[in-house]
């Protein structure tokens, strides 16, 4: 099953280090254009990008995927919609960083019973808050454009 396979790769370290991936050399062959590929399932990418969630940031990942950021931003916009009328994405980023959104989000989490120490992840939290504001004020395309600018895998592949 896919999730068990992911867990095995996570535990073996092959998501973090290219050399940890086990490739069966007996299933090696060349394509018509001379490229070496391996059989046996799965794809080894041309550009290896280590899995970005280092041990210890699982809580932040879970939090960002929980929908809590979405609800928080919705409530912020519901209370202050006029403040954001006509704002650009760049000005929105400045507003998120200069405003009290990080502390307000921590309070919002605590009220919901979630107690995470986010101080070491403040920049990431602010980034995800900014992205969610962009999604709710603009559209999904603007949201994903913003996320992809900070996506390590996308950036590494584009730099090749």
Annotated model-derived regions:
Residues 2-160:
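Conserved functional hotspot residues or short segments at active or partner-binding sites
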């Amino acid at each position: 099953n896919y999730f068990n396979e992911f867990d095995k790769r996570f535990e073996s370290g092959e998501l973090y280090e290219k050399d940890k991936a086990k490739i069966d050399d007996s299933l090696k062959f060349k394509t018509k254009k001379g490229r070496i590929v391996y059989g046996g399932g799965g794809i080894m990418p041309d550009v290896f990008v280590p899995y970005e969630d280092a041990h210890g940031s699982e809580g932040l990942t879970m939090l960002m995927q929980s929908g809590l950021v979405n609800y928080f931003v919705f409530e912020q916009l519901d209370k202050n919609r006029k403040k954001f009328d006509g704002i650009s994405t760049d000005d929105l980023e400045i507003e998120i960083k200069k405003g009290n959104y990080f502390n307000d989000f921590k309070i919002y989490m605590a009220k919901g019973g979630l107690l995470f120490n986010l101080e070491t992840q403040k920049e990431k939290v602010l980034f995800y808050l900014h992205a969610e504001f962009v999604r709710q004020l603009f559209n999904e395309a603007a949201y994903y454009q913003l996320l992809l600018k900070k996506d390590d895998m996308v950036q590494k592949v584009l730099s090749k």
